[in-house]
Structure formats: structure tokens, C-alpha cells
């Protein structure tokens, strides 16, 4: 199949001149040419979401541009890459497209929000959280596309937009990027970003001071509201009641609602069913931990922003060691730069590796090394460690092994489960969470983990 078509290339060039940069980069550029026969132009979108959005929002625009180039009417149809056979797409070209897409940062052609505009909109937005600073990867492409769609057309299809994902994966960044985008397009837009904790405190304050009218005006008379960490509504009955009516008032007035949580609506506990139902009535988009390629792109972009030159092998080393979230990844980058600056040591893997703690083993280790060291330390056999034994000494050793493997290798949760005798990824996740909790409350566990880390460091440095 021909994947580079001169007509589609010309159409893209034309659209690049007429559409905003974020719109073009997010929707038009990723679309791949499939075929052009008898006036029918077939395009392949990366996923069903993109295909549907293109069909609803850009079909006529593309058809008009194609008609101007071809000199006759052109009908455009869209297919989803996920719904067609893998052999119908040139995979090499598609992979290149995805790699390029990951490293592009999208935003308006204008500059960041100016202090003047911010003074007009006391919205609580962080200047750093804009689309152009967000690195898009397979883990976040859907959430990014949905966020941009809402920023471009608020109060329409995706209302509310519910963004969910673990800590430090970019939920707040995307939420606030929506707010910045709206303020740039319309400086008079009333945008409000607030954490659930702040909303709760405002409600409590309003009750105490008999000022609920002012609180309701504050939250209900906005064009766009961004509510972070909605899971903290759990158990707060009166606050839930107030938020329920606030949600209804905003939705009925056509205001856009964006909500972020560490889990999807159907997994929230201690929250009224009627609220969960409303959270689910729009679009839910999750963000997963970034893959190695995306983590590398994030570090490269951060190095560019900080005007730092880091060796490629060091960037890859950091990207390989910090796998759970972006916050940890960027924190490791900052510590590495600070360490090299203070000590005067060169920016190399050998010099930086030992200080990349506390959540990283700090050296290159293999799954076999982790299992061997944990087995030796706790004096349990390797076979018993990877078995299904629930004896407390074995179970505790296994949990620590899973924790160390998570933070000492770039293996995914399912892969770690495989290393421990085919355990389910949820079992691995639970084990890691248990160790993380105990590290701050149980000195004995903390000491055991640190001693095994030290043993792994000693072994690994022999190979540096």
C-alpha cells in the first residue's frame, strides 16, 4: 500500500497553514494515507477516538482542502488503525510517525500566559503546565487528545472530561494546560483550577461564616472548572452534596467540567452513586506510566529546557531506572545535575548511579540478581521465593523482592510477576505498595531493603 501520497501531502500542507498548530499536530499530522480511488480519500487514524474526532470535526475542512487541490469533489472517510489488520499499514512508516509524535510538544502559537492575563484570571494555574511542555507518548495520547479537544471545544461532547491515572503521571499538567489554552484564546474566560481539598475547605468556611452564597458564586459562575484529586471527596457527605449541585449547575449552563482522580469513576469508594454516574457521563481518559522511549523523550526535553547537555547513555540509564512516574523521573534528573555540579564529577553513569536513591537501587541489576540476593538475605530457597507459599517469612521476602525488582529494573508489573513464578500484576502492585508503606513506618523493613540494595550495588559496580 502506498503510504506517502502527493495529494494527501499537499492537503496536509494546506491545512497546516489554516489550522492552529496544536490542532494540526494532534489530529491531522498523525493521520496516514490509505488509498485514493474514484474521488474517495481514505485515511487511517491512530485509534478509534482520533478517527471519530476527525470525522465529526475535520471532515468538511479536509474535503474542502482536497477539492481545491484536485479540482473536483473529494469525499473523505476515516478508518482506525486499531480496527484494521496490521498488514494493511506500512508498520515502519507508522512507527516513525509515532516516535516523531512522542517528541512533539503542542501548544498555541502564542507565548505562555502573560502576567497581565493571569491577573485578570486569578485561576490558580501553574505557568509551567502548558501543552507545549507535555511530552506525548502511547501512555498518554488518548488523554492528551481528549484534553486538547476540550480546550478547543469546551462544553460539548466530553463534558465532563475525567482524567485518571497514578501519582505523577501528568494529570494536573493536562488539566491546567486546558485552562491556559482557554485563557489564551479568550482572556475574558472565567477559568478556575482547584483541588478537592481546597473546595472542601471553602465549603467548610462558607458554612461557618454563613457565606455559602459567595462560595457558590465562586464555583458556579465559571466557564471552565478544573477539579483535581476528586477521590478525596470520599466520606465527605456535605461536600459531596454541595459538589453535586455545583456540577449540575455548571453542566446545565454549558460550562466545561474537567475532573482528575487516581482511579476511574467506577473504582471510587465512599462517594455517592449519583456523583459517580455524573463523572461517567462524559469522557474518561486514563494515563499510564510512560514506556522507556517516552521517558527518554521526557528527559531529553527537560535537558533542552534546562539548557543542560547530558550524555545519551546517562539519559537512557535514568530513564531505565525510574519507571513508575514522571515526577520521580524528573526528580532523578534534577538530583543528577545537582550532584555533578556540587561534586565536580563528570556526568557519567558510573559517577551518578550510586546517588540515584531513595526509590532506585541505583545500579543496573537483573531479575536474577534480585532474586538471588533476596533469597540469600532471607535464607529462603529460590524455588520457595517464587512459589505460592504464604508463610510470612517467604511472603515478606517475596514482596521486598518485587519492590526491588520494580525499582532496580525496567520490567513491567506483568514481567515482574512472571519472574516470581507467574504472579498476577495486581499481586505485584499490592506487594510494592505494602513495602512502600512499611518503609516509612517499620525501621526493620527499611533496614532490610537498604542492606539488600547495598549488596546489589556492590555486585553491580564490579561490572561497571
UniProtKB/Swiss-Prot annotation:
One of its GO terms (biological process) is regulation of DNA replication. Residues 124-340 are annotated as: Domain III, AAA+ region. One of its GO terms (molecular function) is ATP hydrolysis activity. Its main location: cytoplasm. NCBIfam families: DnaA (TIGR00362). Gene3D superfamilies: 1.10.1750.10, 1.10.8.60, 3.30.300.180, P-loop containing nucleotide triphosphate hydrolases (3.40.50.300). Oligomerizes as a right-handed, spiral filament on DNA at oriC. PROSITE patterns: DNAA. SUPFAM superfamilies: P-loop containing nucleoside triphosphate hydrolases, TrpR-like. InterPro entries: AAA+_ATPase (IPR003593), Chromosome_initiator_DnaA (IPR001957), Chromosome_initiator_DnaA-like (IPR020591), Chromosome_initiator_DnaA_CS (IPR018312), DnaA_C (IPR013159), DnaA_dom (IPR013317), DnaA_N_dom (IPR024633), DnaA_N_sf (IPR038454). Residues 1-79 are annotated as: Domain I, interacts with DnaA modulators. Pfam families: Bac_DnaA, Bac_DnaA_C, DnaA_N. The gene is dnaA. It is found in: Cytoplasm. Keywords: ATP-binding, Cytoplasm, DNA replication, DNA-binding, Lipid-binding, Nucleotide-binding. ATP binds at residues 168, 170-172. Residues 79-123 are annotated as: Domain II. Domain I is involved in oligomerization and binding regulators, domain II is flexibile and of varying length in different bacteria, domain III forms the AAA+ region, while domain IV binds dsDNA. Residues 341-464 are annotated as: Domain IV, binds dsDNA. The keyword Nucleus does not apply. This is Chromosomal replication initiator protein DnaA. Plays an essential role in the initiation and regulation of chromosomal replication. ATP-DnaA binds to the origin of replication (oriC) to initiate formation of the DNA replication initiation complex once per cell cycle. Binds the DnaA box (a 9 base pair repeat at the origin) and separates the double-stranded (ds)DNA. Forms a right-handed helical filament on oriC DNA; dsDNA binds to the exterior of the filament while single-stranded (ss)DNA is stabiized in the filament's interior. GO terms for cellular component: cytoplasm; plasma membrane. Belongs to the DnaA family.
Amino acid at each position: 500500500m502506498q503510504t506517502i501520497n502527493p495529494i494527501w501531502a499537499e492537503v496536509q500542507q494546506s491545512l497546516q497553514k489554516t489550522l492552529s498548530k496544536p490542532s494540526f499536530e494532534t489530529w491531522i499530522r498523525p493521520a496516514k494515507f490509505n488509498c485514493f480511488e474514484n474521488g474517495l480519500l481514505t485515511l487511517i487514524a491512530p485509534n478509534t477516538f482520533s478517527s471519530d474526532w476527525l470525522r465529526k470535526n475535520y471532515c468538511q475542512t479536509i474535503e474542502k482542502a482536497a477539492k481545491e487541490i484536485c479540482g473536483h469533489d473529494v469525499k473523505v472517510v476515516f478508518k482506525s488503525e486499531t480496527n484494521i489488520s496490521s498488514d494493511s499499514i506500512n508498520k515502519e512508516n507508522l512507527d516513525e510517525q509515532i516516535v516523531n509524535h512522542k517528541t512533539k510538544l503542542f501548544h498555541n502559537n502564542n507565548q505562555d500566559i502573560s502576567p497581565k492575563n493571569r491577573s485578570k484570571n486569578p485561576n490558580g494555574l501553574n505557568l509551567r503546565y502548558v501543552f507545549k511542555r507535555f511530552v506525548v507518548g502511547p501512555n498518554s495520547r488518548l488523554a492528551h487528545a481528549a484534553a486538547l479537544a476540550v480546550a478547543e471545544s469546551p462544553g460539548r461532547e466530553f463534558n465532563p472530561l475525567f482524567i485518571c491515572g497514578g501519582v505523577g503521571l501528568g494529570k494536573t499538567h493536562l488539566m491546567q494546560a486546558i485552562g491556559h489554552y482557554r485563557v489564551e484564546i479568550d482572556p475574558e474566560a472565567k477559568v478556575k483550577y482547584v483541588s478537592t481539598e481546597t473546595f472542601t475547605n471553602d465549603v467548610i468556611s462558607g458554612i461557618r461564616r454563613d457565606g455559602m452564597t459567595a462560595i457558590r458564586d465562586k464555583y458556579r459562575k465559571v466557564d471552565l472548572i478544573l477539579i483535581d484529586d476528586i477521590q478525596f471527596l470520599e466520606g465527605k457527605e456535605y461536600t459531596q452534596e454541595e459538589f453535586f449541585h455545583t456540577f449540575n449547575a455548571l453542566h446545565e449552563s454549558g460550562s466545561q467540567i474537567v475532573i482528575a482522580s487516581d482511579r476511574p469513576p467506577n473504582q471510587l469508594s465512599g462517594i455517592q452513586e449519583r456523583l459517580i454516574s455524573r463523572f461517567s457521563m462524559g469522557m474518561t481518559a486514563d494515563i499510564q506510566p510512560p514506556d522507556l522511549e517516552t521517558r527518554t523523550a521526557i528527559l531529553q526535553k527537560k535537558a533542552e529546557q534546562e539548557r543542560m547537555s547530558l550524555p545519551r547513555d546517562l539519559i537512557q540509564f535514568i530513564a531505565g531506572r525510574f519507571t513508575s512516574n514522571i515526577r520521580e523521573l524528573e526528580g532523578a534528573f534534577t538530583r543528577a545535575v545537582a550532584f555533578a555540579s556540587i561534586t565536580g564529577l563528570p556526568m557519567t553513569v558510573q559517577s551518578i548511579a550510586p546517588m540515584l536513591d531513595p526509590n532506585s537501587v541505583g545500579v543496573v541489576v537483573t531479575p536474577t540478581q534480585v532474586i538471588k540476593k533476596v533469597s540469600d538475605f532471607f535464607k529462603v530457597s529460590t524455588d520457595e521465593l517464587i512459589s505460592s507459599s504464604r508463610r510470612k517469612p517467604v511472603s515478606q521476602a517475596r514482596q521486598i523482592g518485587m519492590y526491588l525488582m520494580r525499582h532496580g529494573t525496567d520490567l513491567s508489573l506483568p514481567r515482574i510477576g512472571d519472574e516470581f513464578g507467574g504472579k498476577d500484576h495486581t499481586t505485584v502492585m499490592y506487594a510494592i505498595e505494602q513495602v512502600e508503606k512499611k518503609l516509612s513506618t517499620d525501621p526493620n523493613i527499611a533496614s532490610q531493603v537498604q542492606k539488600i540494595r547495598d549488596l546489589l550495588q556492590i555486585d553491580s559496580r564490579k561490572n561497571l
